[in-house]
Amino acid sequence: MYALQNAALRLEVSARGAEIQSLVDLTDGREIIWHGDATCWNGRSPLLFPITGGLWNGTCRLDGRSYQIPKHGFVRRRDWQFVEQGEDFIRFAIENTDEELKQFPWPYRLEVTYTLRERTLRTDLRVTNRSHHSSMWFQVGAHPALNLRDWTPDGQRVAGFLRFEGAPRDLLRAGSQGCIEPARVPIPWSKNLQTLAALAFHQMGNALVPIGVDTFANEALIFDARQVEAVEVLDRKRRRYARVASSAPVWLIW
């Protein structure tokens, strides 16, 4: 286990998957990252490459050949190489194996750098195509899971709210085999007066989505086309608990 700490946060990362295992707010001792309880989900914050999500029949086709790639790729199941650590950052890297070339026909190098800056954790991913002779098709993503302050095991009560930065319009959803369906669906906005007023005046930054069973009736909220720039997680009293920002063109909230 590798650790990085400043005055506000303590980060722990495992070599397996270069996955965050813990992120503690040192002001109150609160654990921010989900603890990997297998009764719900045994992950914490895996990195996804060379695909995010799944493929139809687990197969991609290129130049007349078929390749079997597991859901979310394969780097989350491997041990990464520790590269270096500084006062405020830690870096890991992974390169393809010969066996992986049977699943994904490009030699690659993937690096992740975690940086602590005051009360912010920054994650940077760098992908290198090592083939030097053909363009590499890939997806890369992060899958962080956060502890909810007001979550209850039965899941029946609203555990908090989501507030979006950007211009959220509508959603995609996963269908058969976890692949995206073509139809677009409405965002499950809260029915409270604050949100109804915000939507009426197109003030999307004041509109909230409840975190509850009904919100995730179709498993996930999938925003494409750079609709979302950041998401705030609020507790039941609408106090900000965490903020996640990314330049990724697609967000999936699960």
Predicted regions and their residues:
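Active-site/ligand-binding surface loops and adjacent short beta/alpha elements
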Residues: 137, 145-249
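Acidic, contiguous internal or C-terminal segments within carbohydrate-active enzymes
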Residues: 96-153
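A short, structured loop/turn motif at beta-sheet edges
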Residues: 83-90, 115-120, 131, 156, ...
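Beta-strand-rich N-terminal accessory domains
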Residues: 1-62, 66-69, 226-247
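Short Pro/Gly-enriched beta-strand edge/turn motifs at strand-loop
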Residues: 39-45, 63-66, 92-98, 212-216
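Extended, loop-rich substrate-binding clefts of extracytoplasmic carbohydrate-active enzymes
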Residues: 65-118
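Beta-strand secondary-structure signal
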Residues: 1-3, 10-12, 89-93, 111-113, ...
